[in-house]
């Protein structure tokens, strides 16, 4: 599936990861959409998490609250977005602990704690396949940034 990402959503994502990470820590947001318009990403949720050297951990209680909100609002998580300090890649921890474990789920990694220009240049996108493993995919084939 190719998701449509409003430029405003991308801008708000960069604002959030820059504020949360302060150029020193990883940060995560989740892009969601309604079940009746799956391809149209329209909200971001900043997970409650603890950042540590080399990663982050999402609070268990927040995850439970978040799933309940999604159910009430008839929404789903489509893309997990997080930052890395330097180059973008998917770490072993990223592979092991995604927020969603289903084929087709996407994880987008933004380099340099999101301090670079707003956009997807230098970002890394990966997808869970039916074999349960992550595989790098082409950003342009999966995410269309709308102006």
What is the role of each PLM region?
Residues 1-77, 86-147:
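Conserved beta-strand-loop surface patch within small alpha/beta domains used
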């Amino acid at each position: 599936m190719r998701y449509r990402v409003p430029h405003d959503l991308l801008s708000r994502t960069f604002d959030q990861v820059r504020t949360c990470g302060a150029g020193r820590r990883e940060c995560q947001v989740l892009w969601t959409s309604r079940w009746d318009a799956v391809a149209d990403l329209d909200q971001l949720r900043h997970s409650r998490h603890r950042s540590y050297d080399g990663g982050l951990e999402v609070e268990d209680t927040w995850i439970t609250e978040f799933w309940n909100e999604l159910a009430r609002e008839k929404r789903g998580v489509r893309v997990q977005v997080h930052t890395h300090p330097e180059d973008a890649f998917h770490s072993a921890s990223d592979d092991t602990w995604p927020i969603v474990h289903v084929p087709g789920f996407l994880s987008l990694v933004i380099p340099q704690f999101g301090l670079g220009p707003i956009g997807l240049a230098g970002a890394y996108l990966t997808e869970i396949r039916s074999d349960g493993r992550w595989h790098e995919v082409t950003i342009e084939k999966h995410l269309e940034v709308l102006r």
